[in-house]
């Protein structure tokens, strides 16, 4: 690690001090990315900025020929996603999207099992991400302390419509659209990405959803509770995905369960079981055979998903960073290529469009845009 770039002088200093405390290294401090790239003393960057900035910051890195590890979501609008995708592909940099499930040992086992055909046709997927955290994405003390003069508000906004300085939208951006979609971009994109990975579909055919701010009425604009229903594929190979998430009660925690006619693949227990499979008494009546999966443990080594904001403490994130660093050295494709980032962006933006308009969202392959009510969705 040779330096830290941050437009807020406090975070810039704190970042450098943190690195020194951990490594003993005295690193450079850059006021912005242009200053960092002008010095040209770096080989790669880790982009951990506001959600809506990720794709644009990736473009900057790609144009400077720097390898990238970028946090998810990749983009919150299709225009940004397209820019990021094209920049990475043109530059041929090593790219890793921060979807750390793609480096989890149990997720690789699940992917291999489904693709082997032993699981059978996926007929339904249920996903949850529940916490009880009124403090999640809140930074009230820092909101009181930060001053506009100590950062660069115009640079922060990048391509979003200009509005006057807001310390909450700067620091608590995950609660405010169009700086973040909130739950879809922060959590859902992790889980829906596994659907694309395991099944080979690039994006949903349609998404409907609703939600609201039902409890934490603290001025936020993004929902504290939401449910979305995804339709994938067609009449021959299609299935439904049900996703729900709430900030208001943690029962159920994080769940990802794949269903076939023969049972379930549960990524919370890391087991395949015949739970819910077709039993003989019902099958025989229709001249069919019983269909019950053999029990199967995905992996002896569990890669556990966590609900803490500090994702650096889980082994999936460590494995994912290691995979990126290895690929930077050997110039091979990472576990989280830019196509995966682009595809989870499509699903995320479709969900945001459905939630914010109350309409069914679809995707136009020809123009690569999310459509609601016959119009392209942006903000």
Tell where the protein language model's regions lie, with residue ranges:
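Rossmann-fold dehydrogenase core element
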Residues: 83-101, 110, 120-125
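N-terminal glycine-/serine-/threonine-rich beta1-alpha1-beta2 phosphate-ribose binding loop
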Residues: 1-70, 82-94
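General small-molecule cofactor/ligand-binding pocket signal
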Residues: 2, 28-30, 96, 208, ...
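Short strand-turn motif at the edge of the Rossmann-like AdoMet-binding core
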Residues: 72-74, 98-101, 129, 338
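Short loop/turn motifs at secondary-structure junctions
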Residues: 25-26, 41, 118-121, 200-203
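Extracytoplasmic/secreted proteins, especially bacterial periplasmic and envelope-associated proteins
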Residues: 10-14, 32, 53-60, 79-83, ...
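Solvent-exposed loop/turn segments at secondary-structure junctions
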Residues: 7-11, 51-53, 75-77, 101-104, ...
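Contiguous beta-strand/loop segments that form the cofactor/metal-binding neighborhood of enzyme cores
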Residues: 108-109, 121, 126-130, 135-339, ...
């Amino acid at each position: 690690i040779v330096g830290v770039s941050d437009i807020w002088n406090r975070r810039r200093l704190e970042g450098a001090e943190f690195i020194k405390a951990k490594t003993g290294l005295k690193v450079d401090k850059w006021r912005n990315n242009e200053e960092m790239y002008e010095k040209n003393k770096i080989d790669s960057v880790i982009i951990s900025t506001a959600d809506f900035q990720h794709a644009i910051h990736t473009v900057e890195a790609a144009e400077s020929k720097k390898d990238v590890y970028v946090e998810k979501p990749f983009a919150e609008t299709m225009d940004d996603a397209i820019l990021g995708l094209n920049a990475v592909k043109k530059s041929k940099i090593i790219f890793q999207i921060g979807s750390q499930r793609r480096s989890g040992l149990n997720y690789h086992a699940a992917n291999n099992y489904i693709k082997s055909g032993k699981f059978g046709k996926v007929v339904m997927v249920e996903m949850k991400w529940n916490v009880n955290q009124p403090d999640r994405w809140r930074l009230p003390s820092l909101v009181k302390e930060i001053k506009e003069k100590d950062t660069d508000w115009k640079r922060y906004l990048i391509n979003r419509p200009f509005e006057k300085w807001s310390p909450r939208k700067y620091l608590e951006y995950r609660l405010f659209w169009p700086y973040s979609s909130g739950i879809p971009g922060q959590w859902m994109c992790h889980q829906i990405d596994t659907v694309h990975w395991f099944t080979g579909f690039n994006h949903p055919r349609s998404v409907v959803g609703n939600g609201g701010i039902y409890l934490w009425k603290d001025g936020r604009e993004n929902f504290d509770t939401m449910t979305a229903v995804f339709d994938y594929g067609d009449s021959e190979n299609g299935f439904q995905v049900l996703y729900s998430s709430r900030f208001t009660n943690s029962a159920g925690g994080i769940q990802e369960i794949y269903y076939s006619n023969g049972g379930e693949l549960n990524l919370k227990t890391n087991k395949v079981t015949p739970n819910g499979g077709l039993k003989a008494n019902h099958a025989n009546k229709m001249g069919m055979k019983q269909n019950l999966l053999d029990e199967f443990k995905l992996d002896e080594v569990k890669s556990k998903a966590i609900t803490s904001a500090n994702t650096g403490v889980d082994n999936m994130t460590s494995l994912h960073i290691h995979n990126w660093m290895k690929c930077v050295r050997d110039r091979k494709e990472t576990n989280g290529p830019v196509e995966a980032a682009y595809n989870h962006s499509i699903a995320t933006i479709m969900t945001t469009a459905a939630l914010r308009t109350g309409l069914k969202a679809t995707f136009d392959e020809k123009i690569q845009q999310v459509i609601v009510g016959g119009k392209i969705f942006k903000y």
